[in-house]
Amino acid sequence: MKDKVRVAVVGGSGYTGGELLRILVTHPKTEISVITSREYAGKPVSLIHPNLRGLISLNFTNFSIDKISDKADAIFLALPHGVSLNYAPKLLDLGLTVVDLSADFRLKNPELYKIWYNYEHPYPDLLDKAVYGLPELHYEELKNAKLIASPGCNATATILALAPIVATKITDEKKFISDVKVGSSEGGAKPSEGSHHPERQNAIRPYEAEGHRHAAEAEQELSRIAKANISVSIVPHAVSSIRGALASAHTWLTNELEEIEIWKKIAEFYRGKRFIRIIRGNIHPYPDPKFVIGSNFADIGFAVEKRISRLTTFSAIDNLMKGAAGQAVQAFNISMGFNEDDGLKLVPLRPA
């Protein structure tokens, strides 16, 4: 292997692309060789990402598969849903490792793309080959993976909250509700009526409450763990913070367990997981996205309302890090045989 892996970031002008660059520019084993943007081709990267001044001297270029294959060993696709699938097959044929941050290869059942994304998937064979890039659940499969499907942020928060619950049979319930509060950066760099600052500030606004498409990912992964059909309703809420996502996942206890037993089961499930922190019994008793901002950590906690046997598990992440770019690099590291935390030894910001 070369001293450093040459990486390309396709779609490098958005928030997720910029976050990938922020991580990769200090990664000890990568060299950023190509950064593409159709809109800003020819312009300096630091013009669009001023936080990278003095760190990246490259200009954005137009995306060309043939040219990029000569300059890169691995490629991160930070593109809209339905776009990456047009490029991934040829990139794989050219021998590149592909990390796709869209939803195009996350779901194993091609029929689900008709339901949730309104298109028929043209490469169902690649869905079988793609590895869902949640390292806490797929670490071994990610080793030497060539096509990584990086999870969605709301799906990540929900799955991390519920995985230990279904895996360790803390409850026999098969239906869960995940209430996710998420910051405005989830909406991307291009403002819309819903993400425009005057409209978003001071808002707590539910959206896609009748069925959020990240539920398909959550059900797929949780059903696999539980070896049973799990149903998840994800109800996201847009809040006025810029970064961060908090999933509060609700269910009912069907088994008589003391809280210490629940804590032990969750802690054991996540034992040795580099970026999982279990939050319990301090002056900040529940996970809060404020304390993971800028990092790849996921803080996990829970609460039991004994009166009605309600169990709520919490998962706090930075939606641009563990919910997007950070997790993508974490999965990439594993696929390359690097240290899992290369480029990701980032301390959360405080205050944030």
UniProtKB/Swiss-Prot annotation:
Pathway: Amino-acid biosynthesis; L-lysine biosynthesis via AAA pathway; L-lysine from L-alpha-aminoadipate (Thermus route): step 3/5; Amino-acid biosynthesis; L-arginine biosynthesis. NADP(+) binds at residues 13-16, 319. The active site is at residue 153. GO terms for cellular component: cytoplasm. Its EC number is 1.2.1.103, 1.2.1.106. One of its GO terms (biological process) is lysine biosynthetic process via aminoadipic acid. It comes from the Archaea. CDD domains: AGPR_1_C_LysY (cd23939), AGPR_1_N (cd17895). Keywords: Amino-acid biosynthesis, Arginine biosynthesis, Cytoplasm, Lysine biosynthesis, NADP, Oxidoreductase. The keyword Oxidoreductase applies. The keyword Amino-acid biosynthesis applies. This is [LysW]-L-2-aminoadipate/[LysW]-L-glutamate phosphate reductase.
